[in-house]
Amino acid sequence: MKLIDILKDLPVLETNADLNADITDVCYDSRQAGEGCLFVAIAGAETDGHKYIPMARERGAACVVCQHAPDAAIPYVVVEDSRRALAVIACNWFDHPSRELTMIGVTGTSGKTTSTYLIKSILEQKAGAKVGLIGTIQNMIGSEVLHTERTTPESFELQKLLRQMSDAGCTHVVMEVSSHALVLDRVYGIRFAVGIFTNLSQDHLDFHHTMEAYCDAKAILFDRCDVGVYNADDPWHTRLLQNAKCPRLFSYGIHAAGTDLKAKSVQLHPGSVAFDAEADTEWAHVRVGIPAQFTVYNTLDAMACCWNLGVPLTECADALARNHGVKGRMEIIPTPGKDYTILNDYSHKPDALENVLESVNGFAKGRTVVLFGCGGDRDKTKRPVMGGIAARLADFVIVTSDNPRTEDPQSIIDDILAGMRDTDTPYVAIPDRVEAIHYAMDHAQGGDVIILAGKGHEDYQEIDHVHYPMDERVIVADYLKH
């Protein structure tokens, strides 16, 4: 592709490059540079890509996009923001695949993954759609499963994936859109047919620093969608909508008055939730096989999205009744022959842990037992908060390790326990997560619900940059054999 075509719609501050030069590839990692490629130098959180311009040149790069003229003897294009430039370049390189797809973006602290799976399920069953999915657990092209490394891929990988999806015949794409992705322009250049806001609670403050900045990051999505679907029960929706530029807003909720889609007569069961959904003159009874109060919100935003795309509520409800849940989201781990229940859930944030515990308290016949830890090298302020939530809502707490990463596991546990000091809730601290799970099973009583919180779909534990195999389903199954 000609350099001039790659740079279309990109404001250029300065260049000495031949705009008619043929470019063979695009990269932003100098180690991937090759003969005739365009290297985009990005100033990242840990390193500055401008340092690697000489290496890219040595590897054959024909031109570099950067934020200041390089010292190395190489044709260059200077732009104001090379990260945003990468997004524009990616759109051009892959010929704007998002324009060929009905794009649906879901943002919020919790509920993104479940919502995307529910939307995919409804559209495939009731709209005759082939749906691409991009998210935390995995990426999917229809039923084909692809590996994923982060909630929202970098802009170049994202556009490449969207091109794959379009070429494979996908009509719709539903994707989780993280606050990082919005701030770091990973989704820049994409227009969403529907943008969804699930909720906002403490998370990623190591990146955003304040809740207001975190909310404003989420709000970017509502500048880039045709319909903005939002949770009217979440108090942050007011700030989120202050400057929203989307032409149509659509609200959902359980408690808020005047919502466009409302859940009534909510019933919580051990293996499901049920409620009546109302929008305009339409009504439908809904049952979903994910046992939690917050499932109602995830279901409402999925129904709101699909209703705005032309699927009647009754059709949404019929599709949802056939859905059997999402891996690592209130997932029941089989315990044949035992009179206790083990749930696996990805709740690694304060509000998610609180929601899970409140939901389980609503149907547990025995004790509510929670086993959890907090991730290392992440927001430390939420650790005592989560400890306090666990102590307040659970009958017994087992504090253990999540992904310690480069931190000392005991230090993380001590941070969590700081939030439990003034409570009389019994607890035990066991740094080894496998031992902790065995302890929970050994001490289970009849009717107990044991929540293994934090890992969810993950089948590994990260310690000192190494991913060690750890699948809680396998741990439970193996222990039951002995």
Regions found by a protein language model. Name each.
Residues 1-12, 35-38, 84, 124, ...:
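ATP-dependent carboxylate-amine ligase
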Residues 3, 9, 66, 70-73, ...:
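Acidic, Mg2+-coordinating active-site environments of NTP-dependent enzymes
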Residues 1-88, 262, 267, 291, ...:
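N-terminal leader/targeting and accessory segments in enzymes
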Residues 72-73, 140-145, 202-207, 378, ...:
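A short acidic, helix-capping loop that chelates divalent metal ions and anchors anionic groups
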Residues 62-68, 228-232, 371-372, 395-403:
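Short internal beta-strands
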